[in-house]
Amino acid sequence: MRKPLMAGNWKMNKTVSEAVSFVKALKGAVTGVSNVEILVCPAFTVLYEVNNEIKGSNINLGAQNLFGEAKGAFTGEISTAMIRDTGCSYVIVGHSERRQYFGETDEAVNKKTKAALAADITPIVCVGETLKERENNVTFSVIEKQVRNGLADLTLQQASLTVIAYEPVWAIGTGKTATPDQAQEVHSFIRKIYAQMYEESAEKVRILYGGSVNPGNVSDLMKKSDIDGGLVGGASLEAESFTKLVKYSK
């Protein structure tokens, strides 16, 4: 049985004081929740303070990115050791905004994924198609390429520990959402490709949906057999709305 994961991706939002206020409110609201794994992924600048605030709670900490090298002359980058030192157990890899604005390739995603796993940090590896790709009916070929290249050459154990997030790029921050059936179709396809690559690990891997998840659609999405949680953007920035996602009912 795959435990649902609700992951809040704060993107470039929240100062230290705003972040601390948020997690204080969230911590109180989700006390006692054990059937859903809760994750917040703040900006690098507030990881330390957020970690101090959530210690001993049921909230996990993740980073939004990492670099594939252990250390060195890579100005502006951050390593797995630095992330772990702030208390992170997860890291987002290959988010569509990283691919779009910073030119991240599947090969870079693969390197980061392996670096995270080597450091015992769980990568949340993002895949997804643009609106143009969906309209051109190449969604599945795009997704297959991203999965096969971005998640190549893992051990079976690493493959089962990895989390995948399907984020249709056309549904991120637009208010548009893939219907539950559309999302399930792609999630099922991802699991099928993963099974070809890593056999039984495909049944263990959690596949999150990330595309304008909100309190109004989360229950219908989570009813689908291959949707194991959400990678949440805007709705994770307010404690009240994120709590509703965490406490969704099928």
From Swiss-Prot:
HAMAP family on file: TIM_B
Record-stated family: Belongs to the triosephosphate isomerase family.
Subcellular location: Cytoplasm
Source organism: Endomicrobium trichonymphae
Signal sequence extent: none
Gene Ontology MF annotations: triose-phosphate isomerase activity
EC number in record: 5.3.1.1
Subunit annotation: Homodimer.
Catalyzed reactions: D-glyceraldehyde 3-phosphate = dihydroxyacetone phosphate
Keywords tagged on the record: Cytoplasm, Gluconeogenesis, Glycolysis, Isomerase
Gene3D superfamilies attached to this UniProt entry: Aldolase class I (3.20.20.70)
GO terms, biological process: gluconeogenesis; glyceraldehyde-3-phosphate biosynthetic process; glycerol catabolic process; glycolytic process
Positions annotated to bind substrate: 9-11, 173, 212, 233-234
Active site: 95, 167
Stated role: Involved in the gluconeogenesis. Catalyzes stereospecifically the conversion of dihydroxyacetone phosphate (DHAP) to D-glyceraldehyde-3-phosphate (G3P).
UniProt pathway: Carbohydrate biosynthesis; gluconeogenesis; Carbohydrate degradation; glycolysis; D-glyceraldehyde 3-phosphate from glycerone phosphate: step 1/1
GO cellular component: cytosol
Class of the enzyme per the UniProt entry, highest EC level: isomerase
Top-level taxon: Bacteria
Primary residence: cytoplasm
Protein name per its UniProtKB record: Triosephosphate isomerase
